[in-house]
């Protein structure tokens, strides 16, 4: 059992106390200690040991309850205003969908939610189920090779060769936006991301059979920051900037995507089997990093360990409002409930829906007269076995009528589930290689990175009180000092990763000042933010650039609606500066 299990930790503490206190008691009162067999060395009496274990378990649970910082108060408020803080972050990975170029005849769109199965793992040989988090378009196209080279004037150059299917002409391939995944270790992937998105100076295309090359007006756009790129569902009342931070600290691979734009303007000979894209860089490419086709992949997409889950119908009890939910098939004990999506009852062929309490559409909310009479709320509690139990709390006038007048009534549930830590129980060797749905062409699946461990909301260090203090404040106090900014960002790091700690510790100084100017007859107000970073806390300049891009996007979302933001990073010890353009809010953050 993992020592991160609080119940086990309290149990062990109570057992240690009983044994240590028992020795002292035996020395002070040997006649009475003899009755409990405490005065003799060696093996303890098994009946006394059972008594101690039972007492230690009960007292451990009691101490855990005394130390839990009143979750009944804080969790209710947090779940209403910031529900993302009480949700598990399931296991994540990146998969590659490789179509058979001999069979695919046109561009094929794979919708979000495409299911992938792992190879059987665990004692019960369970196949973990993952689903894609965004749409992906499969093209009759392959990235045949990736290499580095030099221009005649010495500038670094990256060469990408794209090859088409022999049966599909270039005119039928959609080249307008090609997502590419940078499949490498963090230092190389970050350097490649920076080179393509920030250090690109010129782009050329060289078509097979032609001696010269054509200039191209294209670019690589950073991917992973848009609303459609979210890894897990976002509640209607949740602020998207918080999820951005959680995704950055939990699964940075998500931001290792770039979108190649501008290839659709090319005129390519129909019979040409391939063309080379040459990217000339403004800064020299690091000599320590070699490149191959394995480092840039087409048709990659993030996947998450979430799937539709069946649950037993819920029988109402006249004396009960809280119900422990159990999946229909527990398998080997690693199946957990991620969310309750729908609760319904039936009355004389009429469907009665329970609405989420956080939607404010129940009779205690704003639409008092028109609102439904039934609502539900969920709460996550850690069980004694270390897993997380989901409790369903029902309420409303209609619910009171159902349970008192019709106690035999059953509710139907629609759940979303996850396999918890099972994908990482097999020594991190879980392989995702099976597509559930059939396609009209051959499709090979493989995961490009190991599935991550799930991350659970922190339950210590007065976590809920800290986020209430942070989220109740506005934008500018967060920029008062480096310590405040570090503490704010640390609330979103649930992994305990040493690399994340080093990045946060690298924030040396934070300053800001308000600026205003007239532009086209309007008074513009903004805040100029300057953050000094210790470059030694990052895995190269590319890592710094991605961290800055994340902060730039977060500040733009979090700032007051009447303020624009502009971020500048100053790197120590070199003194180099990275400055982003102004971000003008177009809508109220949310």
Residue locations for each model-derived region?
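Short linear motifs embedded in intrinsically disordered, proline/glycine-rich low-complexity segments
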Residues: 1, 9-10, 17, 58-65, ...
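Mixed-charge (acidic/basic) macromolecular-recognition segments
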Residues: 1-32, 36, 228-268, 274-276, ...
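Extended assembly-interface regions of large multimeric machines
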Residues: 1-211, 217
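C-terminal domain/tail detector
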Residues: 31, 347-590
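Extracellular ectodomain segments of secreted/surface proteins
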Residues: 58-66, 84, 145-155, 161-174, ...
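Residues at beta-strand starts and edge strands
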Residues: 89-93, 154-158, 174-176, 199, ...
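Short, aromatic- and glycine-rich surface loops/edge beta-strands on solvent-exposed regions
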Residues: 117, 272-282, 409-417
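Short, low-complexity Pro/Thr/Gly
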Residues: 161, 167-371
